[in-house]
Structures are given as C-alpha cells and as structure tokens.
Amino acid sequence: MPTINQLIRKGREKQLKRKKTPALQACPQRRGVCTRVYTTTPKKPNSALRKVARVRLTNAIEVTAYIGGEGHNLQEHSVVLIRGGRVKDLPGVRYHIVRGSLDTAGVADRRQGRSKYGAKRPK
C-alpha cells in the first residue's frame, strides 16, 4: 500500500485494456483475400469440422476467420469481408467472415436469421 506522499510523487498507473480485435484497427469491418480455406476441430467437449479461412487483410495482417452457416463457396484468392466476433471453441479464431458480401455467397435455403447469413427473403 503506497503512502499519500508516494501517490503524489508517482500516481497510479492506468491498467491498459487489451483489444479483442486488433487486426481491424478500430474499423467495423475489413476486406481481405483468402490464403487458405480449411476445416479444424473444436476444443475438448465439442466435436465437429469447423470451416475456417486464413485471410490476408488490406492492412497486411493475416488472421484466421470463421465461415458461418451451412455450406460455402470460398476458395483461395476469394475476396472476403471480415468482422469481429470470436468462436468460443476454436482457439485463435477471433473474426467472422460476413456472408453475402464481396465473393462470399449467402446461405442457401435459410429461413430464419437471414440477415446474419446474407440470405434473400424467400418468395
């Protein structure tokens, strides 16, 4: 515990808050090019093949982004838009690919929560 005099001389040091999406550099989304599209397995209690892509952003940072929804059309050199948002059971995946924008197609036959998957309203 510092004395009053020590606090007057030095003051308290501000605790810095770690950013959750540093690669976006305070932008809402960022554009990038897929360098690798592959599947990974999630952490311990879960089991699946999660679709992810390694993306090189326009600011030259390379990140791993999750491809949400059922089925996708992404391959190497696809231009994608990424947003923040981690995937809890995939370590190191802190970004999501925005469906229905740039080269990413929306999810086909999606009826509920369509706006999150870039799906048009069914007739």
UniProtKB/Swiss-Prot annotation:
Its assembly, as annotated, is:
Part of the 30S ribosomal subunit. Contacts proteins S8 and S17. May interact with IF1 in the 30S initiation complex.
Q: Which Pfam families match?
A: Ribosom_S12_S23
Gene Ontology biological process: translation
Has UniProt tagged this entry with the keyword 4Fe-4S?
no
Q: Which residues carry this modification: 3-methylthioaspartic acid?
A: 89
What this protein is called in its record is Small ribosomal subunit protein uS12
Pull one GO CC term from this UniProt entry.
small ribosomal subunit
* Protein function: With S4 and S5 plays an important role in translational accuracy.
What UniProt keywords apply to this chain's record, in alphabetical order? Methylation, Ribonucleoprotein, Ribosomal protein, RNA-binding, rRNA-binding, tRNA-binding
Keyword tRNA-binding belongs to the record: yes
Tell me one GO molecular function of this protein: tRNA binding
Record-stated family: Belongs to the universal ribosomal protein uS12 family.
Task: Name the domain of life this protein comes from.
Answer: Bacteria
